[in-house]
UniProtKB/Swiss-Prot annotation:
Phosphoenolpyruvate binds at residues 20, 92, 120, 165, 335, 377. One of its GO terms (biological process) is aromatic amino acid family biosynthetic process. It is found in: Cytoplasm. This is 3-phosphoshikimate 1-carboxyvinyltransferase. One of its GO terms (molecular function) is 3-phosphoshikimate 1-carboxyvinyltransferase activity. The lineage of its organism: Archaea, Methanobacteriati, Methanobacteriota, Stenosarchaea group, Methanomicrobia. Pathway: Metabolic intermediate biosynthesis; chorismate biosynthesis. Its EC number is 2.5.1.19. GO terms for cellular component: cytoplasm. 3-phosphoshikimate binds at residues 20-21, 25, 163-165, 191, 304, 331.
Length: 422
């Protein structure tokens, strides 16, 4: 299904969608905790549903209710049924975190996914699990692969600059072992706020993580406690709403906790740096259109913001440099390439660098036929760009936003955007 976008002005109020990152962690930790946990207001997108399906397959009892998921955990320690297969669809978070958990369980688990997921790098994590003693089989360092456990713990070495999800997977699974687990990072950690989010979520369930000189220590003997978790709004998804307002109107977004550890909360300060009108009042953020000025933005710790920040930069006076996000080349698409491709097709003055892009603005954008490569963030960023284009923009895959923000098009229409699916 295609998305057709025409030039529009937007205004109004909308509630931020639930956080994808928090929902993944809530489902996983509830499944590992002994007792009943309730996850309130979760995001039920394609990625988080892949995680929920996986924890069911691994032994958790799940009951779906109105705006809540009840999980009876603690059964994942039982021997796994022979031939257990986990299909993580397109979810990198699911496969990377669940692989760590599978290494601690008694039995063999096979992991697979769609074509895109099966092309994404897993080798650093698979090598780390092998170092811990897991049986690992993989033809090329990607899915499909199998993990045979259980491993007890010990010292493990892993790169920190490929995916923070590798580190989160090792951390979440560590308390299941009989020995302490020390995670040694062999390169600097990128997207550290996502690891901090994992550590914060673990703490809420009664498990502490210690920082050591080159990584993290999780002591054995800790047990996850059951907890009810309220999932807050998602700054990563709200960034598309913010940018739309900064370019084409004024909107208020509610449900965004200023104390939330999400790294993508930095989008608010980025908008201020570009010169957008920003007003924060508790959990409400109002963004209004303003003349934007160029800025240099380090996205090492907030790489998911890259596509939409590039759209903003295309409308800022002067030359902006977005950098620090080389690991974006291993996302659902090569996100640096796909971002530059769609913006250039719309008339932006933009060029790739190894770890980001250089953009000179403001550009008069024209409508174009956009290829998303099945990437939800490219779909939403290009749709926002279409709001200020001189002619109609056609986005090739309207449905891929269901991965992280299923209600994106409806929310934009509510705000007055001329968008339709066909």
């Amino acid at each position: 299904m295609k998305l057709i976008v025409s030039r529009s002005q937007i205004s109004g109020c909308v509630h931020a969608p639930p956080s994808k990152s928090h929902t993944h962690r809530a489902f996983l930790l509830a499944s590992l905790a002994k007792g009943e946990s309730v996850v309130l207001s979760p995001l039920l997108g394609e990625d988080t549903l892949a995680t929920l399906s996986a924890v069911k397959a691994l032994g958790a009892n799940v009951c779906e209710g109105d705006d809540r998921i009840t999980i009876q955990g603690g059964n994942l320690h039982a021997p796994l049924p022979k031939g257990t297969v986990i299909n993580c669809k397109n979810s990198g978070t699911s496969i990377r975190m669940l692989a760590g958990i599978a290494s601690r369980l008694d039995g063999t688990t096979e992991f697979t996914g769609d074509a895109s997921l099966c092309s994404r790098p897993m080798k650093p994590l698979l090598d780390a699990l092998s170092e811990l003693g897991a049986g690992v089989t993989s033809d090329n360092g990607c899915a499909p692969f199998t993990i045979t456990g259980p491993v007890s713990g010990g010292d493990v070495h892993i790169r920190g600059d490929v995916s923070s999800q590798f580190i989160s997977g090792l951390l979440i699974s560590a308390p299941l072992g009989k020995a302490d687990t020390r995670i040694h990072l062999t390169t600097p950690l990128t997207s550290k706020p996502y690891v901090d989010m994992t550590i914060s979520a673990m703490k809420k369930h009664g498990v502490s993580v210690e920082t050591i000189e080159d990584g993290y220590l999780v002591r054995s003997g800790q047990v996850y406690s059951s907890e009810d978790v309220q999932v807050g709004g998602d700054y990563s998804s709200a960034a598309f709403l913010f940018a739309a307002a900064a370019l084409a109107g004024e909107i208020a977004v509610s449900g965004l906790d200023p104390a939330d550890p999400q790294g993508d909360q930095v989008v608010i300060s980025i908008l201020e740096t570009f010169g957008a009108g920003v007003v924060r009042d508790g959990e409400n953020v109002t963004i209004r259109k303003a003349a934007l000025k160029a800025a240099d933005i380090d996205l090492a710790n907030a790489p998911d913001l890259f596509p939409i920040i590039a759209v903003l930069a295309s409308q800022a006076k002067g030359t902006s440099r977005l950098y620090g996000a080389a690991h974006l080349r291993f996302k659902e698409s090569d996100r640096i390439m796909s971002t530059v491709l769609f913006l250039r097709s719309m008339g932006a003055d933009i060029s790739e660098t190894e770890d980001g892009c250089i953009v000179t603005g403001p550009a008069n954008l024209s409508g174009a036929n956009v290829t998303t490569f099945g990437d939800h963030r490219i779909m939403m960023a290009s749709a926002v760009a279409g709001l200020i284009a001189d002619s109609t923009t056609t986005v090739d895959d309207a449905g891929c936003c269901a991965v992280s923000y299923p209600g994106f098009v409806k929310d934009m229409q509510k705000l007055g955007a001329d968008m339709r699916e066909e």
